């Protein structure tokens, strides 16, 4: 399997090169040359680690099947507490795919616990011995998951950049207390898009790349712009379908809809790949919060990033520049020239408009909707009081939109992307309680109010020492990168 850039299909690389490099030289994202067709029925018989290895090896063809099988078995074992890809019934034929049972209590663990192994193996495959410097812009959960996955990995340094004031206190402490000799964390003045733009500028700066290479350092990414982040997320769509099949809730071949809370479009794009591989995915419903740039685009065909930015209770979705949408645009248009033009317009004008036939093709698979802050709080309370199901703010966004887009007779799977205990104050307030200012006190009150236990890794943060408190401007991200030595 070869990969090429969304902006220049003449730039072809192997999967190892795509993962080691992260972003194409001209700024495009790597995509596979084709969608492998798989035996869905056979895959549905496998446990999660075996399923992961089987799906991933269809794309990572220069990795040995033995390596992928062992890596998947190691990754998705004890660290996920036996709940990798766990599907929970909620109400009727609506389900929650709980993706927060990993080490950092967010769906990013599915990719970022495996990805360090993929990177180390990629370097072996390519015969590379240089140090890898990973730069991560995060709306929060990616940062902690990347830090947890990459800490103390030999030959790797990782620096994470998150928007100051754009996280819950629990999320901030998850990053600020991270252990490891090779990790660094910076708060960036501004929002996620400011951090992401700063990191992308470093990746696109040939002078910085040349200077670092002279020191024996190569840049790479752990954001979902890296193919190694995206491919493990395809797996849990198959896992959800398999569980519905085994439970007798569907017959083989029946369509299942998925509603995904997303800002950067990576998690929902993984569902698109699953569909193109042959999984009977019906509609992929894109759920946004008040930063509803994706809802507007999927409705009108015009993407406008120049708009008011809202800090919401679902901060991982507080994004206005959605990177992975570029991959979908390439797959739908089939034109690197067209995609390059659209991305140029976005960079220069803050907007672009796709052709009507492109929008129509996208709407065949994708539906959309958004939730206000009031609706998010109401959804948390409704799900708990009516169904006994406790969810976080991001998942509540998706539940609200899923109810609007639910099709009669078609099961709806909502991707539950984070533990409710990562946002204890917001969840407690949504349940009609007065939340204390301290997140840990709120966590204890949420436990008492609901009878649910907070994940041990979150409760333990209270006793951990903070290591990182540096605040920088977006323009200083380049200085951070240039400060590294081999």
Give short role names for the model-derived ranges:
Residues 1-486:
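PLP-dependent amino-acid enzyme catalytic core
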């Amino acid at each position: 399997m070869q990969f090429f850039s969304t902006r220049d299909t003449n730039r072809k690389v192997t999967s190892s090169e795509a993962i080691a490099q992260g972003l194409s030289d001209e700024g495009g994202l790597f995509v596979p040359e084709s969608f492998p067709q798989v035996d869905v029925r056979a895959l549905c018989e496998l446990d999660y680690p075996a399923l992961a290895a089987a799906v991933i090896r269809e794309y990572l063809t220069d990795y040995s099947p033995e390596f992928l099988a062992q890596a998947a078995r190691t990754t998705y074992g004890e660290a996920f507490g036996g709940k990798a890809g766990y599907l929970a019934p909620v109400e009727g034929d609506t389900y929650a795919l709980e993706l927060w049972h990993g080490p950092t209590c967010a769906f990013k663990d599915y990719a970022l616990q495996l990805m360090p192994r993929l990177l180390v193996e990629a370097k072996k495959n390519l015969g590379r011995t240089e140090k890898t410097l990973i730069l991560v812009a995060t709306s929060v959960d990616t940062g902690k998951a990347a830090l947890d996955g990459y800490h103390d990995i030999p030959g790797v340094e990782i620096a994470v950049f998150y928007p100051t004031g754009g996280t819950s206190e629990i999320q901030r402490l998850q990053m600020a207390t991270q252990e490891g000799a090779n990790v660094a964390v910076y708060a960036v003045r501004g929002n996620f898009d400011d951090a992401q733009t700063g990191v992308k500028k470093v990746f696109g700066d040939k002078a910085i790349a040349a200077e670092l290479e002279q020191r024996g350092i190569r840049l790479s990414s752990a954001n979902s712009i890296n193919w190694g982040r995206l491919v493990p997320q395809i797996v849990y769509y198959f896992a959800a379908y398999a569980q519905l099949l085994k439970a007798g809730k569907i017959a083989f071949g029946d369509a299942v809809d998925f509603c995904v809370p997303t800002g950067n479009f990576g998690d929902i794009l993984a569902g698109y790949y699953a569909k193109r591989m042959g999984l009977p995915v019906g509609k992929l419903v894109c759920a946004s919060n008040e930063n509803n740039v994706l809802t507007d685009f999927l409705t009108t065909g015009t993407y406008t990033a120049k708009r008011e930015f809202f800090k919401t209770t679902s901060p991982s979705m507080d994004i206005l520049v959605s990177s992975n949408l570029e991959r979908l645009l390439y797959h739908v248009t089939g034109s690197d020239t067209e995609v390059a033009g659209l991305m140029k317009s976005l960079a220069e004008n803050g907007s672009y408009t796709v052709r009507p036939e492109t929008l129509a093709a996208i709407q065949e698979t994708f539906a959309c909707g958004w939730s206000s802050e009031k609706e998010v709080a109401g959804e948390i309370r409704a799900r708990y009081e009516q169904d006994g199901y406790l969810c976080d703010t991001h998942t509540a966004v998706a539940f609200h939109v899923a109810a609007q887009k639910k099709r009669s007779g078609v099961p709806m799977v909502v991707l539950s992307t984070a533990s409710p205990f990562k946002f204890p104050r917001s969840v407690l307030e949504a349940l009609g309680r007065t939340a204390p200012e301290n997140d840990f006190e709120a966590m204890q009150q949420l436990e008492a109010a609901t009878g649910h236990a907070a994940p041990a890794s979150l409760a333990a943060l209270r006793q951990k020492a903070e290591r990182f408190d540096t605040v920088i401007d977006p323009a200083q991200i380049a200085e951070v990168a240039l400060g590294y030595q081999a």
